[in-house]
Amino acid sequence: MKKIWVSTTLTAFAAIGFSAQAQAAKIDVCVFDLLGKSGESYQMAQEWALAAKGWGAEVNLIPRQDEAVADNDFKAGKCEGVFMTAMRARQYNKFAGSIDALGGAPNNAIAQRAISFALDKRNAAKMVTNLGGKKYEVAGI
């Protein structure tokens, strides 16, 4: 199963996926950040990758300054996971991909409530999507 982290304009970052069978092995994750390795999203991904070592995962971050390239690399199997914006992640999961829709969250307080609602464990089933025989799961927002 692939996991999806979704970035919104109101939160700092997000990502899309890694395969469940690769959890104990080395996991390549493409990270979209306009500033590449210098960007805030990439730096947060580095913190996440460091924390993942404590869970037994070896995460290799691959910076991408073009979101389409990150997505295409993910589709081509060059990365088991990808950090991307919610707009692009919508093709994988419409539930999480709708959080930063235009006019959907007119202020940060509403955005925080939407994110909290989306990440509530009662909505776990909505974070998993089956597309063309492949499962994708939103892993973070």
Where do the model's predicted regions map?
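Signal peptide-proximal N-terminal region
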Residues: 49-59
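Contiguous mixed-secondary-structure segments that line small-molecule binding/active-site clefts
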Residues: 85-141
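Immediate post-signal peptide segment of exported/extracytoplasmic ligand-binding proteins
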Residues: 21-32, 53-55, 132-134
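Short helix-initiation/N-cap motifs at beta->coil->alpha
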Residues: 60-72
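Bacterial N-terminal signal peptides that target proteins for export
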Residues: 1-9
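Extracytoplasmic "Venus flytrap"
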Residues: 26-46
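C-terminal segment of classical bacterial N-terminal signal peptides
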Residues: 14-22
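Alpha-to-beta junction loops
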Residues: 55-57, 75-84
